[in-house]
Amino acid sequence: MKKSLLSLLSLFVVILGFIACNEDDTVDYSDYYEWKNQNNDVMLRMHDYQKRLGQYAYFTDTIVSQAEPLSFRCLYRVITPANEDSLRAINRWYTPYYTSTLKMHYTLYDPKSVMSKLPVDEASFNNPEIMDKIFFDSENKADTLESQQVTFFQAFTCASVIVGWAEILQHMHIGDNWLVAIPWYLAYGQAGNSTIDPYSNLYFRMELVDITKLGGPVPEGSGI
């Protein structure tokens, strides 16, 4: 399964790169190089903190990318864990497959607003009280940090979303509510989209509400 999943995700990254080259070849990406460096620096710091501080870091855990295993990983902080007793009682203690159909809540935070408010020093960056004001107060205080989207997203498969989402969702259980940080190349990459600049790390709150269709492992020898 891992081999097939790696092949699928690698293909998805290639497709994203192909689309970016064909749709955005008139864009001067040198205009975004400083922004790219800022996003890389933040990811480097977060990975360093997580590695050295473990559960004392604000983002306490990472997920190794199947598509880019040697690069920066997605990071996450558990807001609310799944209720293990209830999940076991209804025999749904599983995580999605790449082909599963899901329902979820998510909040996407504006990358530039987050960047402007992230602390510079290590102690503040890993202080939950300080960091929570960036990611939680914003839902009620638009002047602190305006959430870009608050959406109940349903009836989609892992394969239909950005690579970072696909990889994170396959580690979540129903009821898990996480704050996640996704490196730009596992998000919208160099191309960006209509509302996200190129080279933008993305920050989400993600809650897996249900797995409406479990799907299954990608078959070996599928040719993908």
What are these regions (language model features)?
Residues 1-21:
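Sec-dependent bacterial lipoprotein signal peptides
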Residues 5, 21-224:
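Cross-family detector of peptidyl-prolyl cis-trans isomerase
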